[in-house]
A protein has these predicted regions:
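N-terminal beta1-alpha1-beta2 submodule of the flavodoxin-like/Rossmannoid cofactor-binding fold
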Residues: 1-75, 124-131
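Glycine-/small-residue-rich active-site loops that bind phosphorylated ligands and cofactors
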Residues: 13, 61, 90-93, 119
Length: 131
């Protein structure tokens, strides 16, 4: 299965999780989204149309996907065949993120997972079900 890991990280938490996913999925492709806040644009986005599955990793912002991931989905959501979502956060917001993804892709995720910041700091999480 050809997999693309797409991630955005402002503080490094989502980047850490994406790195673990990439290491576990030896041979997958990855794309780090670079966000220009002033222009509200992203760079570094790869077209997901040639991939069987996309794993998206990003922080939750205000009970929703981070703006860079929303921009990615606005541009490429229709090209995503199958996807999983992993979000990092301080608390709540997974259901809002899933709604964002379903709206952009027209599909339910294969899986969705929230990793709280305290779990991340303690390395107390298991991403294997998302792989």
């Amino acid at each position: 299965m050809k997999t693309l890991v797409v991630y955005y990280s402002k503080t490094g938490n989502a980047r850490k999780v994406a790195g673990i996913v990439i290491n576990e999925l030896d041979g997958c492709d990855s794309s780090e989204l670079l966000f220009d806040e002033k222009a509200n644009t992203i760079e570094g986005a790869k077209d997901p149309s040639g991939f069987d599955r996309v794993i998206m990793v990003c922080p939750i912002w205000a009970f929703s996907l981070s703006t860079p991931m929303k921009l990615y989905l606005k541009q490429y959501g229709g090209a995503i065949q199958n996807y999983s979502l992993i979000v990092t956060c301080g608390g709540l917001g997974l259901s809002g993120c899933v709604r964002n993804c379903v709206k952009a892709t027209g599909k339910q995720p294969l899986g969705a997972m929230k990793i709280r910041n305290k779990q991340l700091r303690a390395d107390n999480f298991d991403i294997k079900p998302m792989l």
